[in-house]
Structure formats: C-alpha cells, structure tokens
A protein has these predicted regions:
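PLP-dependent amino-acid enzyme catalytic core
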Residues: 1-209
C-alpha cells in the first residue's frame, strides 16, 4: 500500500495535560486529561492543522497551486487553511458567511487569502460557492484543490487516527489507560478518526462524541 504523504505545519506532539476535575466543575472524582492541539503552533491551533498536513500534502502531490475551502462564521478552518497554505506557497480562496467576524477576516487577509461571502454557513451553501470558485480558477488556468468544510475527508479522519496513536503513546509512557475519550465536533470527521484510532491503539477505551 502506498504511504500517505504529510507535510509539516504544526509542532507535534502536542501536550497531554491533566486538569483538576474541580477546576472544570466536574462533580465526580475523575482524572481528566486534555490533548492540547490548541498549542500546535500555527494560526489559532486546533484540530484542522493535523488534517491540513495530510490534505495539503495531497494538494502538492497533485500539482495544485491553490486551495478552495470554507467554514461557518465560528469555524477555525478558514484561518487555519489560510496560514497553512501561505506557509507552503499555495493561494487560499476562502468562502465565508456574511456574519463572519473581523478577527477571522483580518487573520485570513493577513495570510494573503482571497475571501468570498455567502449568506450563511450551511454546508450546502458553502460547497456550492466553493465549487463555483474552483471552477472559475480552473478557467483562469489554475489548479485548485477543494477542501470541504471541516476538512471532512478520509485524509482528515486519518489525521486524527494518527493523533490518537500519539495520545495513547503519551498516556502509556505515564502508565495511564483511559476509560473514555470524548470528542466534540460538527461534521463528525474528527470523531471518525478518534474512534478509529482508539479502536487501533487503545481498544479498552470507549469513545464518545
């Protein structure tokens, strides 16, 4: 099987940090650990950087010169994609809702991204405009690479299966076996990777979204 390519964007491994249960208002005596992907060192951090390491590697292998993606008004994907693309010399074209705030807009513009507005952040609305932007770029002679909202692709899920290998390895070094791993998300793609990685690397652990 052909190895899956990955570019280096973030600073990994990220810390596995224990947090006091009382500190976060947990009313039962449990040990809580957080996988600190917010500290991966590029943009605002977060889960999209791992996904983009695989997706942008795929874009470069395909000879693409630009990416087209988008996200909701509160999505971290737009900024993550903009700064990651800039680091690799790719143009970033971002579809965002009209309600997107100034911080996201300004960060994306500082990274050199081109912004396109739509009326709302529903996935079907975003994808329609993402495809339209990509089609326009092709007509101009560019080679765009489409990344759907949430970076929700098989490569995106693979990124978090690999993140679980990293996390469970860190836990094992400290003699810890987790009972549960909990993941929040919107599209379900990150959780798919978490569930797969848990099945592979810590089958005794229950995964919950």
């Amino acid at each position: 099987m052909k190895p899956v390519s990955r570019v280096s964007l973030g600073i990994f491994p990220t810390p596995l940090q224990e947090i006091s249960a009382e500190r976060v208002g947990c009313g039962v005596p449990v040990r809580l650990f957080f996988k600190r992907d917010d500290l991966c060192g590029i943009g605002f951090g977060g889960n999209k950087i791992r996904k983009l390491e695989y997706l942008l590697a795929d874009a470069l292998e395909r000879g693409c010169d630009s990416i087209v993606t988008g996200g909701g008004s509160q999505s971290n994907q737009t900024v993550a994609a903009a700064v990651s693309a800039a680091k690799l010399g790719l143009a970033a074209h971002l579809v965002i809702p009209e309600s997107t705030g100034p911080v996201t807009r300004n960060m994306a513009k500082l990274a050199g991204a081109f912004l396109y507005e739509v009326e709302n952040g529903q996935t079907n609305v975003l994808m329609k405009q993402i495809r339209a932007v990509a089609a326009g770029l092709k007509q101009e002679g560019h080679q765009p690479y489409i990344i759907p909202p949430g970076a929700s692709t098989p490569l995106g899920a693979l990124a978090y299966a690999e993140a679980m290998r990293e996390m469970y390895g860190q836990a094992a070094e400290r003699g810890i076996v987790f009972d549960h791993v909990i993941c929040c998300g919107a599209t379900g793609n990150t959780y798919a990777g978490v569930a797969l990685g848990t099945k592979l690397y810590s089958p005794r652990t229950k995964s919950t979204v």
